[in-house]
């Protein structure tokens, strides 16, 4: 009887761009040999809106409402880096109270970012129940944002050159302390529910490994880098805002797999609560914005130095000119290094506004992580990277 010969050839399938686990409009062209992934090509650009060009045709004050749409899970970080770039270039100091308020907002947004990552990631790997718990906790953070800024998820429009738009409202500090007391036991609950679950551990342990050297060579940052054993956090490295005033640690893992990335983010939420508590306890008095910013920029002979204006809050002018020069400024967002390369030419509009999003670099490593893995691991590995396509495509 003749032997039947089975011929197999690679098959190319498209995952996305409209797929429930693609974390935005991302398309993956995956080459398969049976269940094994041979190659993967991410196709991006579906959410490109020309944010850099928009920035070059807006004043800094006008552009702040736009920026929370890059990474719409972490709008405060986008606002922070947007005002930090002109501040550093113009040499505008930020009052201590404003810096503390900024840190509180950034750390709340870091927790919200990690929660928004954790819920869908667990749903991707088959755990549906924690998804609803996590969104419950996120609501409390958005309530705090709403009380301070008037908006919840995005478009907070809260950060300003030289400070913040408004002081914290009456009772806000107490409400934030209550959230910290409420949230830490919930993180313990997540750990009991998820971290010690043998099915979850077997699903992620050893999957999507990346070594320390590879992580550095690929230009990874944030939890992706720290999960591979590199203790690199811009809050410690660049000493921006007032993070040096607080006692906190940089969570690190050495395994470099999906489970390590999960553990690093869980520990980061604990550290963020620690920072928020210290900032609330040490919140100084004084102005919440630099009232001298306008006088400093206009110079000694400005009318703003006159007697008539000495009792008026000298807020930053809407026609603030970005000084001539260039500067790269970065912050540690929930996903990694978020940077702005700014070139000013003594005009109200920037000459160049280059955005360096963290998840764009982190997404580049995906084809390497997927090679040799199973189809079922694609979603788990992609979810562990934490990408937001608004930030990747800009």
UniProtKB/Swiss-Prot annotation:
One of its GO terms (molecular function) is quinone binding. Its main location: membrane. It is a peripheral membrane protein. GO terms for biological process: photosynthesis, light reaction. It holds the Pfam family Complex1_49kDa. It is an enzyme of class 7 (translocase). GO terms for cellular component: plasma membrane-derived thylakoid membrane. It comes from the Bacteria. InterPro entries: NADH_Q_OxRdtase_suD, NADH_UbQ_OxRdtase_49kDa_CS, NDH1_su_D/H, NiFe-Hase_large. The keyword Iron-sulfur does not apply. It catalyses: a plastoquinone + NADH + (n+1) H(+)(in) = a plastoquinol + NAD(+) + n H(+)(out); a plastoquinone + NADPH + (n+1) H(+)(in) = a plastoquinol + NADP(+) + n H(+)(out). Coiled coil: none annotated. SUPFAM superfamilies: HydB/Nqo4-like. NDH-1 shuttles electrons from an unknown electron donor, via FMN and iron-sulfur (Fe-S) centers, to quinones in the respiratory and/or the photosynthetic chain. The immediate electron acceptor for the enzyme in this species is believed to be plastoquinone. Couples the redox reaction to proton translocation, and thus conserves the redox energy in a proton gradient. Cyanobacterial NDH-1 also plays a role in inorganic carbon-concentration. NDH-1 can be composed of about 15 different subunits; different subcomplexes with different compositions have been identified which probably have different functions. HAMAP family: NDH1_NuoD (MF_01358). PANTHER family: NADH DEHYDROGENASE [UBIQUINONE] IRON-SULFUR PROTEIN 2, MITOCHONDRIAL, NADH-UBIQUINONE OXIDOREDUCTASE 49 KDA SUBUNIT. Belongs to the complex I 49 kDa subunit family. NCBIfam families: NuoD, PRK06075.1, PRK07415.1. This is NAD(P)H-quinone oxidoreductase subunit H.
């Amino acid at each position: 009887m003749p032997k039947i010969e089975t011929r197999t050839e690679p098959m190319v399938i498209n995952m996305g761009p409209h797929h429930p686990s693609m974390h935005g409009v991302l398309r993956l062209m995956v080459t398969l040999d049976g269940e094994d992934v041979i190659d993967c090509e991410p196709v991006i650009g579906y959410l490109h809106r020309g944010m850099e060009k928009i920035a070059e045709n807006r004043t800094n004050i006008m552009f702040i409402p736009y920026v929370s749409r890059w990474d719409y899970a972490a709008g405060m970080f986008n606002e922070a880096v947007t005002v930090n770039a002109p501040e550093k270039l113009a040499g505008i100091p930020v009052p201590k109270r404003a810096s503390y308020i900024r840190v509180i907002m950034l750390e709340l947004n870091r927790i919200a970012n990690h929660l928004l990552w954790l819920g869908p990631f667990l749903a991707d790997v088959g755990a549906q129940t924690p998804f609803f718990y996590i969104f419950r906790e996120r609501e409390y953070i958005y309530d705090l944002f709403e009380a301070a800024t008037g908006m919840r998820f995005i478009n907070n429009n809260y950060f300003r050159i030289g400070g913040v738009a408004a002081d914290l409202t009456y009772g806000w500090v107490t409400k934030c302390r209550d959230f910290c007391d409420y949230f830490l036991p919930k993180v313990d609950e997540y750990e009991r529910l998820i971290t010690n679950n043998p099915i979850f551990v077997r699903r992620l342990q050893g999957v999507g490994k990346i070594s320390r050297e590879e992580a550095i060579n690929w230009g990874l940052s944030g939890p992706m880098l720290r999960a591979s054993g590199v203790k690199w956090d811009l809050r410690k490295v660049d000493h921006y805002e007032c993070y040096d005033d607080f006692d906190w640690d940089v969570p690190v893992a050495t395994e470099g797999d999906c489970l390590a990335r999960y553990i690093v983010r869980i520990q980061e939420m604990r550290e963020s609560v620690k920072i928020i508590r210290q900032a609330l306890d040490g919140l100084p008095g004084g102005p919440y914005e630099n009232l001298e910013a306008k006088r400093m920029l206009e110079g000694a002979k400005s009318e703003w130095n006159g007697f008539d204006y000495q009792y008026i809050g000298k807020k930053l002018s809407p026609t603030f000119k970005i000084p001539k020069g260039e500067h790269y400024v970065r912050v540690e967002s929930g996903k990694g290094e978020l940077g702005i390369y700014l070139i000013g030419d003594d005009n109200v509009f920037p000459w160049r506004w280059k955005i360096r999003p963290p998840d764009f670099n982190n997404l580049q490593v995906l084809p390497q992580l997927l090679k040799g893995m199973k189809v079922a691991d694609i979603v788990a590995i992609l979810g562990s990277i934490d990408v937001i396509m608004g930030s990747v495509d800009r």
